[in-house]
Amino acid sequence: MARGSRCLRRAVAECIRNLPSTAGRETPGKSGVRYLSSCGILMTRAPPLFRAVSSRAVVAPARSFFNFAESSNKRKEYSERRIIGYSMQEMYEVVAKVEDYLLFVPWCKKSDVIFRRSGFCKAKLTVGFPPVVENYTSLVSTVRPHLVKASCSDGKLFNHLETVWRFSPGLPGYPRTCTLDFAISFEFRSLLHSQLATVFFDEVVKQMVSAFERRASKLYGPETQIPRELMFHEIHHT
């Protein structure tokens, strides 16, 4: 039994000696595979140039993890314009009533208006989308029935968050319609949270207008039927 164990240990030791080094050198052969140490992945300085196989060498610029994070931590914008089968006044009332957001806005967990005056209100909002929950104050300016503009004033997750809703007349001959313009711009405060941009975009931003439209349907009944050839829906995002 002891003899078998010694043979096994020798075989394992021989395999380890034959493994390629992970110290950053190239292995011989046609594959050209280069093994890097784990700490080398996080180096912000480009590694030393290796000897070219031919007389002409092509060196790709190094890009660190930190550079990638910085490039993704930029302001993102999304805008949408569509014809809605509800009046300007109806859609304005839905958007301006911030205290009801927790009932239908995607991932809104809490919405409390703490101050209100004509054309302005301040609200405490809690928005949760896995794995983050954010509490922030929203400053909301309104112009009935044309505009609702909200901005984040003290969030720890967002460096910038602003939404703008505009309502204008809809189709001629269809009085209970309006043209709705929705725009949102946001930027995460930390490099780590910036990786959540795609989640926030898909789970919250892209569903926003549809959520308010469904709320209008619940409050005011079915929307005005618009002929397909007159329907309009335009989306932009960066």
From Swiss-Prot:
Residues 1-35 form a transit peptide. It is a peripheral membrane protein. It is found in: Mitochondrion inner membrane. GO terms for molecular function: ubiquinone binding. InterPro entries: COQ10-like, COQ10_START, START-like_dom_sf. Keywords: Membrane, Mitochondrion, Mitochondrion inner membrane, Transit peptide. It holds the Pfam family Polyketide_cyc. It comes from the Eukaryota. Belongs to the COQ10 family. Interacts with coenzyme Q. Required for the function of coenzyme Q in the respiratory chain. May serve as a chaperone or may be involved in the transport of Q6 from its site of synthesis to the catalytic sites of the respiratory complexes. This is Coenzyme Q-binding protein COQ10 homolog B, mitochondrial.
